Amino acid sequence: MILVSYKNISSNELKKLIKNNENILLIDVRSEEEFEEVNIETSINIPLQDLLYNIDELQDHNDKDIVIYCRSGHRSITACNLLAMEGFNKFYNLERGIIDYLK
C-alpha cells in the first residue's frame, strides 16, 4: 500500500507563494499543446507520460517545493502519486488545476 505523501494547495495559496518569490518549482503535466496555449508563469512543462523519464532532472531541484498542476487536477494527482513512489516528499498538488488558478 502506498501512502500519499503530497499535500493539496489552493490557487490562492499558490498565488501567494509566487508573489512572495518562494523557492518553488512549478511543473505543468499537461500536453505540450495545452502548455503552449496557457500556463502559469515560471512553470516548466513535463507531460505526465514523460514524468518518470525526467526524474533525474527533478532530483536536481530537491531544495525546492514542487507544485504539480494540470487542467483540472486529475493528471496532477497521478503525477503526485508517481513522485511519491519515486521517493519525493516535498511536493504539492494544485487543487482544481489551472482552470481554477486563472479565475
Where are the regions a protein language model picked out?
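Rhodanese-like catalytic fold shared by cysteine-dependent sulfurtransferases
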Residues: 1-25, 32-65, 71-103
